Amino acid sequence: MSTAQSDALTFECETGNYHTFCPISCVSWLYQKIEDSFFLVIGTKTCGYFLQNAMGVMIFAEPRYAMAELEEGDISAKLNDYGELRRLCLQIKKDRNPSVIFWIGTCTTEIIKMDLEGIAPKLEAEIRVPIVVARANGLDYAFTQGEDTVLAAMAQRCPLNLKNQSDNTSLKTSPHIPLVLFGSLPDPVVTQLTMELKKQGIFVSGWLPSKRYTELPVIKEGYYVAGVNPFLSRTATTLMRRRKTKLIGAPFPIGPDGTRAWIEKICSVMNVKPIGLEDREKAIWASLEDYISLIRGKSVFFMGDNLLEVSLARFLTRCGMTVYEIGIPYMDKRYQAAELALLKATCDKMNVMMPTIVEKPDNYNQVDRIRDLKPDLVITGMAHANPLEARGINTKWSVEFTFAQIHGFTNARDILELVTRPLRRNLSLSELGWDVYSKQS
């Protein structure tokens, strides 16, 4: 492994495969977030099995997603794509009556060149239900980019004007240029971040995605936009290029330090002087001390899975941990520039070595480095957790951070709850004398 530099972050790129979930898994949280939607995944039996395994518990509740399974006739072009999709969408409209239908393309629709973008406008005009096409297929780098693809497609559907004139007037009387935040977060977290900005005198004009498709925010040229997750670079690019918005390049609101930096950057762009953020951050750090004392001085190694690695590494560095390596499937250095700068500043503040950032890491090489470095914790994808545990290495599934509430000041405790769980478990087992896995001769 390269030695970490004292003056700059070290970037490497290996030739490993992308070891991650399929991005169509984004359906599992987006269909719950957008309440009046229906998601139609167009793929093969493999896609169906994956969705059943990922979301099988919800099938009996008649969820708002379905699988359009491709057959031999589809692949050999014997069946008419328009006719088949029309039949399915009419059935969806009759049974569920959604405000929007999302077509989620898969690897197979890419390979057989199915013209979903060409079919959708014609069918939309016929059945009078908006159809949004998102190619959230397994050719992406990380499963979280499925959400990025869907939000980028939704961004182009955001209205230019509100139908309700009174709402339009309220936007015009806003004390600053309208601000739209993008990223799918649970409703309580959306409320928390909106209120944090409101305390500073900054009003959020809307969120992408909104709770309902019919309530998408107005996005005009010159509006400010800010992301809440590191994996939304495609959405940011779409908003800047297609809607001519101004992106606020801020660290992401993960951990007290990241949340404060995120709010401060938005305040600086809006020419608002932030109030009370330093005291708020100090109070949060003080309340986390019972968790931080468990991990201070410990080491962590990120194998790379969901593109949250840099933000989590920065937060854990601030908690006193040493980060040996940040494996990440893909790094958009422009979109994450502010986050990388905060990571470097945090390492300098804590007087620890700069971690090496490895794009597209080779897992065989990573296992060798883990064996040499012997970190106290490895944050990894589900595929590698059990093999590493069998070798006596503490692990945590990175996918848990995707589904947990980790944004904002108060949710930092949830991050530390996840990080410390394997360490607390092993501490309890050792007290019981159960720290040896195999029978000793």
Swiss-Prot record:
Pathway(s) it belongs to: Porphyrin-containing compound metabolism; chlorophyll biosynthesis (light-independent)
Residues that hold [4Fe-4S] cluster according to the record: 22, 47, 107
Annotated InterPro entries: LIPOR_BchN/ChlN (IPR050293), Nase/OxRdtase_comp1 (IPR000510), Protochl_reductN (IPR005970)
Cofactor: [4Fe-4S] cluster
Family annotation (Gene3D superfamilies): Nitrogenase molybdenum iron protein domain
Cofactor binding description: Binds 1 [4Fe-4S] cluster per heterodimer. The cluster is bound at the heterodimer interface by residues from both subunits.
Enzyme superclass (EC): oxidoreductase
Source domain of life: Eukaryota
EC number: 1.3.7.7
Catalytic activity, reaction form: chlorophyllide a + oxidized 2[4Fe-4S]-[ferredoxin] + 2 ADP + 2 phosphate = protochlorophyllide a + reduced 2[4Fe-4S]-[ferredoxin] + 2 ATP + 2 H2O
DNA repair recorded as keyword: no
Protein family (similarity comment): Belongs to the BchN/ChlN family.
PANTHER family (UniProt xref): LIGHT-INDEPENDENT PROTOCHLOROPHYLLIDE REDUCTASE SUBUNIT N
Function: Component of the dark-operative protochlorophyllide reductase (DPOR) that uses Mg-ATP and reduced ferredoxin to reduce ring D of protochlorophyllide (Pchlide) to form chlorophyllide a (Chlide). This reaction is light-independent. The NB-protein (ChlN-ChlB) is the catalytic component of the complex.
Quaternary context: Protochlorophyllide reductase is composed of three subunits; ChlL, ChlN and ChlB. Forms a heterotetramer of two ChlB and two ChlN subunits.
Name the UniProt record assigns to this protein: Light-independent protochlorophyllide reductase subunit N
The species this protein was found in: Pyropia yezoensis
Gene name in the database record: chlN
